[in-house]
């Protein structure tokens, strides 16, 4: 119904009644069935376009997995989650710098210092590339080994979209030293907001779905 334009909010109540306590593996199998079944008119592009909506509908229904090995300190999954926490903190710092820049007069000399600080935070946040590469080279092959081909395919495509959004946002920061600072700042903030939304949605998918599929598969 989502793929035919039905408002997700209209479906959420019925969805919660029928899919209470669904596991991450069940989500993966549903997604796989949608993508690979021949008797439906839903394309991969349709799934990609609505994957954030799909994930959010499952938000309160996904049951976690408390495998002991996943809780061990320095376990790859724990490192993965710690990195996401650091990325969230970096995003908060960037938004705080944007607020500070908006409060300054255009001729305020401290504007350049804040702009430099903003660029440094973008450079730190750009380390998500290592995070994504590890996910794609280590976690995705494990999922495929256990027969879950759809989640890696969808996530990898979204990863590439997020990479493009980050580069677009970074380009706008580089332009902040140009003329028309106020206008440039507004554009830079909007570009970052586009990236931030998709990036945080991916964090949710990683922690609510990807990690749980790995935990259930490896236990």
Question: Over which residues does each language-model region extend?
Answer:
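Small-residue-biased structural context
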Residues: 1-129, 133-219
